UniProtKB/Swiss-Prot annotation:
Function: NAD-dependent histone deacetylase, which could function in telomeric silencing, cell cycle progression and chromosome stability.
Biological source species: Emericella nidulans (strain FGSC A4 / ATCC 38163 / CBS 112.46 / NRRL 194 / M139)
Source organism superkingdom: Eukaryota
Record-given protein name: NAD-dependent protein deacetylase hst1
Database matches in InterPro entries: DHS-like_NAD/FAD-binding_dom, NAD-dep_sirtuin_deacylases, Sirtuin, Sirtuin_cat_small_dom_sf, Ssirtuin_cat_dom
Length: 489
């Protein structure tokens, strides 16, 4: 396929209107509603704010499209199962050309010169043209294509020198400052459900409970209105025993070998502590069950103090509030707290109600204890951005992403924030389409890390790993850097 500029001589007229390639970046460039103005002389702070805001906005915009639009995998392009789509070879060439010449020149060479339709070009960047646009003029696909082009152009590019399992093992042995980014997939072998796996994930279970949006259970507004929704499923994600998976043990092994820079975990189960990973080596991006705080008085306790209530499906209440309520009940009547509002009193007086019957006094209730996990609508801990941008980014020499689909901002943008020359390995059951990793190791996380350790000559001791375990590793057809791990015996 010819992706070169028009032949020498008179160029054909450009089509109008052109794809607005910057459209996907407009929202990112707008100032945040509550953003503090940039102060001169505070370079580190302004850098953190601008980086974090841009990443957050970009991923939210992209996630909306990914939720609404069906994505195309490269294997579907390879197998030709999508009518009217690019072949995999064409798609790869389009992507390569985009990164070679930039967005503006790429649009001129393709859409502006009619070398390919916008509808077909969307498929090169992994987007299935939506059915509601079927029959529409090609210009109707331009906004969608603008998002696809901007997203692809911003993607980290794979390092061509890293492809094989041996390459992964060599990186593991030679690296000294490894960032490990983990998700729910590293805890599923312990019986803790993940969030997104079809039929088995936690979100699927919540859909069966009749929630409009499974994410509502982790929405801070919903929690404030009805904490019972969260506590109805909290027992399913609560770590009940001091166990840890082989993958947690692998992270501990990296620490013991002096190779672990930081474990950024999206998990809230705090199992890393069970494995012996030091607190100073962990950033709990979404908080954890390790502690809990009263939503009324901010009294903080160790998380295990509310475990019994959670296991029973009860809403844990603040012991400090209960103590204060009990003390208040012993005070003379005149010292009790009255209602703040006077309007209710006036309304009752007008209607002839007796306001001296004790209804003027509020009925005290203890506050609800909320585990210190980060709900949707709450800010991530400051430590996340501060450590990533001002400490780890300049030190890291290898990134290993394990057991996460990288769907939630801003953690999902960590691979793209780090220097592009740093090698990155992805370990999970299925590959991700929106991030380019250098090596994809597909399969059960525990199986993959145990085999990596075996090949590296490291001893990963764990009761869940059979000493006689044999693992078959097979390459994925059409992908030189993608490998599947399966236990064979």
């Amino acid at each position: 396929m010819d992706l070169a500029s028009a032949p020498r001589g008179e160029s054909p007229p450009l089509k109008a209107p052109l794809v607005e390639i910057e459209a996907a970046e407009v929202e990112r460039s707008l100032p945040q509603e509550n953003a503090a103005p940039e102060e001169k002389g505070s370079n580190s702070q302004s850098e953190y704010e601008s980086d974090s805001d841009a990443l957050d906005d970009e991923w939210e915009t992209q996630s909306l499209y990914e939720d609404a639009i069906q994505m195309i995998r490269d294997d579907q392009l390879r197998d030709g199962t999508i009518p009217g789509a690019c072949t995999l070879e064409e798609a790869i060439e389009f992507r390569k050309r985009l990164h070679e010449v930039g967005k503006a020149q790429f649009v001129e060479e393709t859409i502006a010169r009619d070398t390919v339709t916008a509808k077909k070009l969307c498929t090169a960047f992994g987007i299935l043209p939506p059915s509601f646009l079927e029959g529409a003029p090609d210009e109707a696909y331009h906004p969608l294509l603008a998002i696809a082009i901007s997203r692809e152009f911003a993607r980290r590019q794979k390092l061509p020198q890293y492809n094989s399992v041996d390459d992964a093992v060599k990186l593991l042995k030679e690296s000294k400052n490894i960032i490990v980014l983990t998700g729910a997939g590293i805890s599923t072998s312990l019986g803790i459900p993940d969030f997104r796996s079809k039929d088995t994930g936690l979100y699927s279970k919540l859909e069966n409970l009749g929630l409009n949006d499974p994410q509502e259970v982790f929405d801070i507004r919903i929690f404030r209105e009805d904490p019972g929704i969260f506590y109805s499923i909290a027992k399913d994600i609560l770590p009940t025993e001091k166990k840890f998976s082989p993958t947690h043990g692998f992270i501990r092994l990296l620490q013991d070998k002096g190779k672990l820079l930081t474990n950024y975990t999206q998990n809230i189960d705090n199992i890393e502590a069970n494995a012996g990973v030091f607190p100073e080596n962990i950033v709990q991006c979404h908080g954890s069950f390790a502690t809990a705080t009263c939503v009324k008085c901010q009294y903080k306790v160790a998380g295990d103090e509310i475990y019994d209530d959670i296991k029973k499906g009860l809403i844990p209440e603040c012991a400090q509030c209960r103590k204060r309520i009990a003390e208040d009940s012993q005070k003379p009547q005149g010292q009790k707290r009255k209602r703040n509002s006077t309007s209710a009193h006036k309304d009752r007086s007008k209607s002839g109600e007796d306001s001296s019957d004790g209804e003027d006094y509020e009925i005290p209730t203890p506050g609800v204890m909320k585990p210190d996990i980060t709900f949707f609508g709450e800010d991530l801990p400051d430590e996340f951005g501060r450590r990533l941008l001002h400490h780890d980014r300049d030190k890291v020499d290898l990134v290993i992403v394990i057991g996460t689909s990288l769907k939630v901002a801003p953690v999902a943008e960590v691979p793209g924030v780090l220097p592009p020359h740093i090698p990155q390995i992805y370990i999970s059951r299925t590959p991700v389409a929106h991030t380019n990793f250098d090596i994809d190791l597909l399969g059960d996380c525990d199986v993959v890390v145990s085999e990596l350790c075996r090949r590296a000559g490291w001893e990963l001791k764990h009761e869940m790993i059979s000493p006689d375990e044999k693992v078959d590793v097979t390459p994925v057809f059409g992908y030189g850097s993608r490998h599947v791990f399966k236990v064979s015996g």
